């Protein structure tokens, strides 16, 4: 792990680093004189309060074309100046995430001191990028009633479906998936400020993190014709954080509801059948406060936000020992601080720290499915040490050459614990007829993951041409530790003892991976047509580190040797997109493309080879003293089936990474 981290860091230092993951916003166009002739050498300056440096500039090339890239979302004014011509100032240009606005102007002959200010409709169509994208701006995020998270908002995108629809924020505590155009639910990619933040565990599509809506300036959803910067197909979710500014500003958002804001369809027939308490909302609320501004004007900005939100739902026909209906209470708190420093004229640094904590009081266990869990037999989810840390540097070396670099980390501690109210000596008991767990949860899960991302690229930009080359490297591990009370689970049928599971806990698994992507993405405009060719190379290596686990009731302490490079994938994915400005006025574009995409994957692929995995014996249980507590002499060991040694799976040495077109 340390070696792979060092290698990735060294690569980042050697390359002239970064435009990290997706297309940047920009402004482009052509400058002409009244006769229609193109004008080279025109100085074009884009200015906006959202830029800590104030403005960015370039000059038109010999064909009169210009392009200014790496602009943050916001409102811009663009000024065009050339000796012998009146200057032109175009105002009200609105840029969203990964959007290139086309602004063509005509300069009139006159004195430079004379100026013309034009305020008109901002370009609405990106005629250069072939990517299909929908953007939820801050205004939309504030006005549309949703659960205030990227998944609930993503349901509004045309063509996007979700595994768990959210109504009124009742489902925001668990992360669903998004699909588009028949994509897999494992192909979502989550990014913050253009950096992929998913950890290596499970199928590779999990973050284990819950996002603060107040942090977001915009959320971009890219759904087709994705460029070479994108690691996979499917839905790419890019959350653009807010920066501070030269003016102090703050907002407060508050919403809430309870049982009085919903109808009740529980009728006498259902109650007569024994269903006397339905699932319903107990309470729901969301409080989100933001504040930001200058520490030093035009040099150092800060932005901070705190969010506390909760969704508490009553569980149908589930009651505690006092007869009260049990509730699944879920609470999340998140605090974020962002600093933006314009260190020198050509060097900008952004530092981002986001800390989140989640608690869920009544969650079903992750091992054995039951229709109903007694409150003491569910698990208590506590996620206390989750944070996102990022340092990002960018430098426009010249008007045509842009470099950036970023280092990103995201520790995840995702724990599903025994209920504090459960008796320390309780044994998990499952009634197979009633499908009910009693006593305590059958398993406690301690989940730990670490992920480090390093990204770098360099962009060369002219009026008609934008060439970008870069890399993205992710390395990390995912680990789970399993514990079972007494290392045993009892099975009954309508209260009659049947069998027991003798479990090899403490057990679990740990897997690691290193995923490196190298890409080249080009964009070239020929008249009204822009082509976007690219190619991406990916190397993905998965291993099982050396690991140890202590002794349990039925098994001794164990140590397992490292298994290196079980999966070693090397893939090449060509990408090609095209965009046609149909009428040449920047209002209508026809887009298309053909591309190869790897499927998103996680280190769970090699988990079946981990000898530390959970396993168990199933044995008959004869409860001689009728105390519903299995003693050793009541377990018929001679008739046990299964094994305390995990049944190892098989990973084909020639396994190829799945892909799609």
Model feature map: region roles:
Residues 2-137, 156:
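Periplasm-facing N-terminal accessory domains of Gram-negative outer-membrane beta-barrel systems
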Residues 85-245, 262, 269-280, 284-293, ...:
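Periplasmic N-terminal accessory/gating domains of Gram-negative outer-membrane beta-barrel systems
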Residues 120, 252-258, 304-308, 351-355, ...:
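Transmembrane beta-barrel strands of outer-membrane/channel proteins
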Residues 163, 546-573, 577-661:
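Solvent-exposed loop/turn elements at secondary-structure boundaries
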Residues 176, 207, 233-235, 285-289, ...:
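Hydrophobic, lipid-facing positions within transmembrane beta-strands of outer-membrane proteins
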Residues 185, 216, 242-244, 284, ...:
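Outer-membrane beta-barrel channels and translocator barrels
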Residues 249, 279-360, 381-410, 574:
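Transmembrane beta-barrel wall of Gram-negative outer-membrane proteins
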């Amino acid at each position: 792990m340390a070696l792979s981290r060092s290698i990735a860091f060294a690569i980042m230092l050697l390359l002239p680093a970064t435009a990290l993951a997706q297309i940047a916003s920009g402004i482009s166009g052509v400058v002409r004189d009244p006769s229609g002739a193109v004008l080279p050498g025109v100085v074009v300056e884009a200015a906006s309060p959202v830029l800590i440096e104030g403005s960015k500039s370039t000059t038109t090339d010999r064909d009169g074309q210009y392009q200014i890239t790496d602009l943050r979302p916001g409102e811009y004014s663009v000024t065009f100046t050339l000796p012998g011509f009146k200057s032109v100032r175009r105002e009200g240009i609105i840029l969203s995430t990964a959007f290139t606005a086309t602004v063509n102007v005509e300069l009139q002959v006159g004195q430079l001191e004379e100026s013309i200010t034009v305020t008109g409709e901002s370009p609405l169509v990106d005629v250069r990028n072939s990517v299909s994208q929908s953007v939820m701006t801050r205004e939309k995020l504030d006005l549309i009633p949703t659960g205030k998270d990227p998944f609930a908002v993503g349901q509004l995108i045309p063509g996007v479906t979700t595994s768990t629809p959210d109504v009124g924020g009742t489902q925001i505590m668990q992360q669903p998936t998004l699909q588009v155009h028949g994509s897999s639910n494992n192909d979502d990619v989550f990014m913050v400020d253009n950096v992929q933040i998913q950890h290596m565990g499970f199928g590779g599509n999990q973050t284990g993190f819950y996002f603060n809506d107040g942090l977001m300036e915009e959320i971009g959803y890219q759904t087709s014709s994705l460029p070479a910067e994108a690691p996979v197909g499917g839905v790419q979710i890019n959350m653009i954080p807010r920066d501070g500014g030269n003016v102090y500003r703050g907002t407060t958002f508050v919403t809430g509801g309870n049982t009085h804001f919903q109808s009740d369809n529980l009728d006498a027939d259902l109650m007569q059948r024994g269903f006397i308490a339905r699932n319903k909302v107990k309470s729901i609320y969301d409080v989100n406060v933001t504040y930001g501004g200058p520490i030093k004007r035009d040099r150092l900005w800060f932005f901070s936000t705190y969010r506390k939100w909760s969704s508490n739902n009553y569980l149908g026909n589930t009651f505690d020992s006092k007869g009260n209906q049990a509730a699944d209470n879920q609470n999340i708190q998140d605090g974020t601080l962002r600093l933006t420093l314009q260190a020198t004229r050509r060097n900008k640094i952004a530092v981002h720290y986001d800390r989140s904590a989640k608690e869920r009081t009544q969650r079903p266990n992750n091992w054995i499915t039951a229709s109903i869990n007694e409150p003491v037999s569910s698990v208590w989810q506590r996620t206390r040490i989750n944070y996102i840390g990022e340092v990002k540097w960018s430098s426009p070396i010249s008007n045509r050459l842009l470099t950036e670099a970023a280092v990103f980390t995201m520790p995840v501690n995702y724990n599903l614990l025994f209920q504090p109210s459960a008796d320390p000596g309780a044994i998990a008991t499952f009634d197979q007829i009633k499908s009910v767990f009693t006593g305590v949860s059958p398993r406690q899960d301690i989940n730990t993951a670490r992920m480090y991302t390093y990204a770098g690229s360099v962009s060369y930009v002219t009026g008609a041409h934008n060439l970008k080359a870069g890399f993205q490297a992710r390395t990390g591990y995912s680990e789970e530790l399993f514990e079972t009370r007494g290392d045993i689970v009892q099975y009954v049928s309508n209260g009659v003892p049947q069998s027991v599971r003798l479990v090899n806990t403490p057990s679990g698994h740990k897997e690691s991976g290193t995923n490196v992507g190298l890409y080249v993405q080009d964009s070239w405009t020929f008249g009204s047509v822009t082509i976007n060719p690219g190619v991406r190379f990916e190397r993905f290596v998965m291993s099982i580190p050396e690991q140890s686990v202590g002794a349990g009731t039925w098994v001794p302490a164990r140590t397992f040797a490292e298994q290196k490079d079980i999966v070693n994938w090397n893939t090449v994915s060509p990408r090609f997109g095209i965009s046609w400005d149909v009428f040449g006025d920047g209002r209508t574009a026809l887009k298309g493309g053909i591309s190869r995409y790897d499927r998103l994957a996680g280190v769970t692929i090699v988990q079946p080879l981990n000898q530390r995995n959970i396993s168990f014996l199933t044995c008959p249980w004869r409860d001689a003293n009728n105390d519903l507590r299995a003693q050793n002499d009541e377990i018929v060991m001679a008739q046990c089936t299964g094994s305390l040694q995990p049944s190892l799976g098989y990973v084909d040495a020639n396994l190829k990474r799945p892909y799609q077109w």
